[in-house]
From Swiss-Prot:
Pathway: Amino-acid biosynthesis; S-adenosyl-L-methionine biosynthesis; S-adenosyl-L-methionine from L-methionine: step 1/1
InterPro entries linked to this entry: ADOMET_SYNTHASE_CS (IPR022631), S-AdoMet_synt_C (IPR022630), S-AdoMet_synt_central (IPR022629), S-AdoMet_synt_N (IPR022628), S-AdoMet_synthetase (IPR002133), S-AdoMet_synthetase_sfam (IPR022636)
Protein name: S-adenosylmethionine synthase
UniProt similarity note: Belongs to the AdoMet synthase family.
Residues binding ATP, per UniProt: H15, D164, A165, K166, R230, F231, D239, R245, K246, A262, K266
Assigned keywords, A-Z: ATP-binding, Cytoplasm, Magnesium, Metal-binding, Nucleotide-binding, One-carbon metabolism, Potassium, Transferase
Organism (species): Klebsiella pneumoniae (strain 342)
Binding-site positions, Mg(2+): D17
Length: 384
């Protein structure tokens, strides 16, 4: 492969779409805490002065949607009308119904192992050995930039920062290996009283330099910090936000394919979410086992049917054992039926709100990031 550039982006927890994702997953977590078998499909819309929470929820739990919403917005940092959005005064509207019984009859079964998929669909999982967390570097460092923005905003290092921010990182590759960072974009909402020069200097020193590895930066690396020159109006005042609109930020930054289904607000019976997590788990264990340098898994389902309709393993020519053997190993060591993967990854717990900002993958404490099958795979493949 010749020299090429690859770019990925991320957005902060204060981005309007991410506010929506976090509210949806906060509602999901609150319900799962009381009722692990609940069926939840929670969608959120945010705009200046208002939040609308809707969807289909079937549960024995009772949760205070308004309180959950306000607490989530407050934790993000929208606590004053000067920011264009205020957790204490925004309107919170609710429009929630129940899951269709037509769907439910295909999911719930007398034998849990025969639990059907909550919908048809295709999901992808991916892993690569180019970073320590077995994720693509561009999206990994894009996430870390906006995580650092939130950190220095909340700890008072840069008190004039506001919650809304975006990052973008362009990496240089030569024959598939990283050789440097070509460009960095960071746009952050800020208070009215900070001048552009001071902002750019502070962002460079407190956010960019502590986050990006120095060996990948050079004299030709380009930096674009608030390139429009002003970013005072942000958050839901600047743009409306919707659950599920940042699916590439949530996954692999465009370096792997995507089945199209969003994650946030969905309980684990929805394979859009749970099977995408399982596919990441499979791909990561294959790479961690040294069976391939890069691995992409596709899995697909039919609504109401337990067994996947297909499983595909793609290793882009980096496999250390035959591709056919990899597919057999996946089928042997990973139960990708809905009930099986829920049990395998222990998904019926309130763990989802934290996933809703800074990426669902590449953070080691999530159960789908375990590499506990790597040694088994390596042994079964006959590698020493």
């Amino acid at each position: 492969m010749a020299k090429h550039l690859f770019t990925s982006e991320s957005v902060s927890e204060g981005h309007p779409d991410k506010i929506a994702d976090q509210i949806s997953d906060a509602v999901l977590d609150a319900i799962l805490e009381q009722d692990p078998k609940a069926r939840v499909a929670c969608e959120t819309y945010v705009k200046t002065g208002m939040v609308l929470v809707g969807g289909e929820i079937t549960t024995s739990a009772w949760v205070d949607i308004e309180e959950i919403t306000r607490n989530t917005v407050r934790e993000i940092g929208y606590v004053h009308s000067d920011m264009g959005f205020d957790a204490n005064s925004c309107a919170v509207l609710s429009a929630i119904g129940k899951q269709s019984p037509d769907i439910n009859q295909g999911v719930d079964r007398a034998d849990p192992l025969e639990q059907g998929a909550g919908d048809q669909g295709l999901m992808f999982g991916y892993a690569t050995n180019e970073t320590d967390v077995l994720m693509p570097a561009p999206v990994t460092y894009a996430h870390r930039l906006v995580q650092r923005q939130a950190e220095v905003r909340k700890n008072g290092t840069l008190p004039w920062l506001r919650p809304d921010a975006k990052s973008q990182v362009t990496f240089q590759y030569d024959d598939g290996k990283i050789v440097g960072i070509d460009a960095v974009v960071l746009s952050t909402q800020h208070a009215e009283d900070i001048d552009q020069k001071s902002l750019q200097e502070a962002v460079m020193e407190e956010i960019i330099k502590p986050t990006l590895p120095t060996e990948w930066l050079n004299a030709s690396t380009k930096f674009f910090i608030n390139p429009t020159g002003r970013f005072v109006i942000g958050g839901p005042m600047g743009d409306c936000g919707l659950t599920g609109r940042k699916i590439i930020v949530d996954t692999y930054g465009g370096m792997a394919r995507h089945g199209g289904g969003a994650f946030s607000g969905k309980d684990p019976s929805k394979v859009d979410r749970s099977a995408a997590y399982a596919a990441r788990y499979v791909a990561k264990n294959i790479v961690a086992a040294g069976l391939a340098d890069r691995c992409e898994i596709q899995v697909s389902y039919a609504i109401g049917v337990a067994e996947p309709t297909s499983i595909m393993v793609e290793t882009f020519g980096t496999e250390k054992v035959p591709s056919e053997q990899l597919t057999l190993l996946v089928r042997e060591f990973f139960d990708l039926r809905p009930y099986g993967l829920i049990q395998m990854l222990d998904l019926l717990h309130p763990i989802y709100k934290e996933t809703a900002a800074y990426g669902h993958f590449g953070r080691e404490h999530f159960p789908w990031e375990k590499t506990d099958k790597a040694a088994l795979l390596r042994e079964a493949a006959g590698l020493k």
